[in-house]
Amino acid sequence: MPRSLRQTIAETRASWARSRAITLPERVAPAPPAPGKSRVAFLIYRGNPRCGGQGVYTRHLTRELVALGHSVEVFSGPPWPELDDGVGFTPVRGLDLYRDPDPFRIPARREFTSREDVSEFLIMLGAGFGEPYAFSRRVHKMLRARRGEFDIVHDNQCMGPGIAALAREGWPLLETLHHPITVDRSIALDHTTGAWKRFTTRRWFGFLRMQVRVLRTLPAVLTVSHNSKVDINAQMGVPLERLTVVPVGVDHEVFRPYPDVVKRPGRLMVTSSSDVPMKGLVPLLEAIAKLRVEREIDLIVIGRPRPGGRVASTIERLGLGDIVTTISGVSDEELARLYGEAEVAIVPSLYEGFSLPAIEAMACAVPVVATTGGALPEVVGVSGETGLLVAPNDPEALVAAIGRLLDDAALRAELGARGRQRVIERFTWQVTARGTAACYDSILQGRPLPASMSFD
């Protein structure tokens, strides 16, 4: 038997041995609504609270909706979200095929209990991503069995056929799409070489055809920036009158300067929720390699680069292992304290539909260097007043902007203070909840969506 085949069989057996059925957490009943408020079914196909912004959005938005008097029950697939008291929770069973420490695992036979399980697994075997499809089918069945318990469904970026079915069946429905995932696909393909890798990248993003098809049928879509609104209209074909803008927020009582935290000279910080080209870590690392020639600096990366991936390989190639530290799994307060130690925070993304890391750093009064990719200029504000903006994918521009801030303590303090004030005035979860609730009211009363919220 060829060694490669023996190795494949051994790895498959090991995966089977490690596989265990998903243990569902207990359902948590939501607090009842106040008079005149809505009963909301909030859907998120994966609620991971530590990786990406979707779990953060879910936790803070649902908490503030409950504070407004609404009753909110979150339906989530694994990994499960962190939710606050008063927010209901119903787990939606899934195979969790990408979980740590066994991503792309082969489930045990006992885990296959429905057609959705089989579909999700077969899509993965075909190099695709089947979670949105399978989750939408599962949650559609669950909601149909509970018709009459909810006034409105709020789906967060699943856009599978089950969501379209809910809309066809007459459920009042609001869709949140943070930015067009077509951009992720384009950037991923631009940074992929080799026929096989390009093929598998296209296969992975195969769910986009489904999402675009579903999205065009939905009557109301909320997005988080004016740039995303324009791009969703242009790239995904959603009419502008079906789109409105409600920005995300930050808890500025947690993300704030802490008097006991001491600045570390030359400390830089970047937060990257995923190890993908769109986050711009490679151009930043190239800039760091140039900056270290003349300066004593170090970089904290909040995130977990893939072993052997593009970011890890770049750190090794540029000899940056002694000044780059990666940290993951921190709490919000720990993250805020890490920001407080930094002299400069960087958001080097090639594109962002909004950017939680930008407003988290600004709320901590840390001066931000960000690119002009996507909505970042909307979020950060005028370059030179509330932050510094540079072209995306430009290491030399990053060197100049970071160096300018490191050399000018007065400018750091000025931009940090103005940035925090901008966030407090514009980007809070209370503002997000009020804007979202206004969308619910418009949908339930048959009115057009509210006007997009201004960032100025």
How does the language model describe each region?
Residues 382-383, 388-395, 404-409:
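Conserved acidic donor-binding segment of nucleotide-sugar-dependent glycosyltransferases
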Residues 350:
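Aromatic "clamp/platform" in nucleotide-sugar-dependent glycosyltransferases that forms part
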Residues 227, 249:
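Carbohydrate-associated surface elements
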Residues 102-127, 167-212:
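Acceptor-binding helix/loop patch of EC 2.4 sugar-transfer enzymes
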Residues 261-288:
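Conserved donor-binding/catalytic core segment of Leloir-type glycosyltransferases
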Residues 367-370:
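Short hydrophobic beta-strand element within catalytic cores of glycosyltransferases
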Residues 2-20, 26-37, 75-140:
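A conserved catalytic-core segment of Leloir-type glycosyltransferases
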Residues 311-333:
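Nucleotide-activated donor-binding/catalytic signature segment of Leloir-type glycosyltransferases, i.e.
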